[in-house]
């Protein structure tokens, strides 16, 4: 997946590796870690942001925007924004957890947005709308994350989801490498595919990200056990 001309990606030098060793990334492995409250709040705010700042924000468009946000941010920092795991489906990358929640939104998400029918040309589609009184909270995000979100909202403000296929279905991109003409249907799209093969110290960067994913998983497990 090509970059979208935002903040420069991190240089993977010694200081970056040290920073990554402290700031654990959400690096999806074979078993996704449970979503923390902070990450859940960030996800809800990201949905609010895209619903407020783009037109025709239905399910598929929202899924694509979240995918582009997560994979661009991972490409730059080694950490996703929402912590979602994406699968390769025919119509593009799908955050499966959100897909499963779509028909019955969790109480916290339902307090922020609703899904309403909207007539578009000759058919009816479901659109995400922000509920009255709900405001986007930028405090949940870093400046880098906000920059990516603003750039995506500006680029795809008036774009319908079918017109975004050229981006999410980019030849030899992350989705395409997994999808493989349907052979990889419903397979997980590794975040590592957002890092090009010729990236400086790619293997070292991904190794640190993987190690810190295990650390993050251990923290989440401890949090869950403490609340049990």
Question: For each of these PLM feature ranges, what is it?
Answer:
Residues 2-7:
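Extreme N-terminal basic, low-complexity initiation segments
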Residues 11-228:
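Domain-edge interaction signal
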């Amino acid at each position: 997946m090509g970059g979208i001309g935002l903040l420069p990606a991190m240089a993977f030098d010694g200081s970056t590796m040290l920073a990554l060793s402290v700031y654990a990334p959400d690096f999806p492995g074979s078993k996704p870690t449970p979503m923390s409250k902070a990450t859940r709040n960030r996800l809800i705010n990201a949905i609010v942001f895209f619903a407020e700042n783009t037109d025709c924000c239905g399910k598929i468009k929202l899924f694509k925007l979240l995918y582009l946000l997560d994979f661009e941010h991972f490409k730059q920092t080694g950490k996703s924004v929402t912590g979602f795991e994406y699968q390769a489906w025919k119509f593009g990358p799908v955050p499966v957890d959100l897909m499963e929640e779509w028909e019955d939104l969790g109480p916290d998400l339902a307090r922020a947005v609703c899904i309403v029918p909207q007539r578009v040309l000759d058919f009816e589609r479901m659109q995400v709308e922000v509920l009255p009184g709900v405001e986007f909270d930028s405090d949940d995000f870093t400046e880098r994350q906000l920059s990516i979100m603003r750039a995506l909202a500006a680029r795809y403000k008036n774009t319908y989801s079918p017109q975004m296929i050229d981006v999410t279905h980019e030849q030899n991109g992350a989705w395409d490498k997994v999808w493989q003409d349907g052979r990889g249907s419903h397979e997980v799209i590794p975040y590592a595919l957002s890092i090009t093969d010729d990236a400086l110290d790619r293997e070292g960067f991904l190794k640190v990200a993987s190690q810190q994913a295990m650390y993050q998983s251990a923290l989440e497990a401890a949090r869950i056990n403490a609340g049990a």
